[in-house]
């Protein structure tokens, strides 16, 4: 069984933090070739200015302790990626609400990690997550029965290579993925109990982390 870890970057153990930065570099810079402005020359880790104290990192480890997935959650009440990524001329209504969190830097194999990330967001008070996906990933989510709500233009009319969409964190959404919110919450390992009132928030010893390949969604 994989282990799901959640916490602020500053709260994660140093070895896990370094492994996460290297994993993100391997996926988003080396494999996908994203031109990320905050990546310094000759460095092999990937962070940006959004990886601060408002941001929650989610890390998936294999039973052997290898990093095989990651995600990043940011509250829309603070600066977040979509607002910077998209121009004001896009005419999008960017949310600013404690119940809406942005999902970014998501990489995982299959759909195993995604419901866990949804559960982390729900544990932080979110009732909805927003983010960008490619049309192919949007189709994948729809095949699983998720109700994607388009925040921007419908993909059939949009000229962008990605789609801005939202998912409501309802019991039905978890059920579509064969998951239960309470069960997922209890399986998440929190570092330094970020949300004391959240059921299932615990601190555990984390096994040694190393990188492994992952499919990106």
Model-assigned labels for residue ranges:
Residues 54-56, 69, 99, 161:
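Residues that flank catalytic or metal-binding motifs in active/ligand-binding sites
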Residues 1-46, 52, 57-67:
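Short amphipathic alpha-helix that is part of the acyltransferase structural core
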Residues 61-94:
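Short, His- and charge-rich active-site/binding loops that engage polyanionic ligands
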Residues 81-163, 167, 171:
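Acyl-donor binding region in acyl/amide transferases
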Residues 58-61, 73, 163-167:
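Short beta-strand element of the conserved SAM-dependent methyltransferase core
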Residues 48-50, 154-155:
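Short glycine-biased active-site loop of nucleotidyltransferases that positions the nucleotide triphosphate
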Residues 105, 159-217:
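Charge-rich, low-complexity intrinsically disordered segments
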Residues 57-59, 72, 117, 130:
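Short, hydrophobic/aromatic-rich beta-strand segments within well-structured domains
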């Amino acid at each position: 069984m994989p282990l799901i870890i959640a916490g602020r970057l500053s709260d994660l153990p140093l070895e896990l933090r370094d492994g996460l930065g290297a994993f993100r570099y391997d996926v988003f810079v080396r494999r996908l070739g994203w031109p990320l402005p905050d990546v310094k020359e000759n460095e092999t880790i990937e962070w940006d200015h959004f990886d601060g104290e408002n941001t929650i990192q989610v890390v998936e480890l294999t039973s052997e302790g290898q990093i095989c997935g990651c995600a990043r959650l940011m509250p829309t009440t603070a600066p977040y990626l979509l607002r910077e990524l998209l121009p004001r001329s896009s005419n999008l209504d960017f949310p600013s609400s404690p119940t809406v969190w942005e999902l970014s830097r998501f990489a995982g194999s299959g759909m195993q990690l995604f419901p866990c990330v949804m559960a982390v967001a729900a544990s932080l008070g979110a009732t909805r997550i927003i983010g960008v996906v490619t049309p192919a990933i949007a189709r994948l989510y729809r095949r699983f029965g998720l109700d994607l709500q388009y925040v921007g233009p419908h993909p059939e009319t949009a000229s962008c290579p990605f789609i801005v969409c939202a998912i409501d964190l309802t019991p039905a959404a978890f059920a579509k993925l064969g998951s239960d919110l309470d069960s997922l919450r209890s399986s998440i390992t929190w570092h330094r109990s970020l949300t004391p009132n959240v059921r299932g928030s615990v601190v555990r010893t984390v096994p040694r982390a190393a990188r492994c390949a992952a499919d990106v969604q």
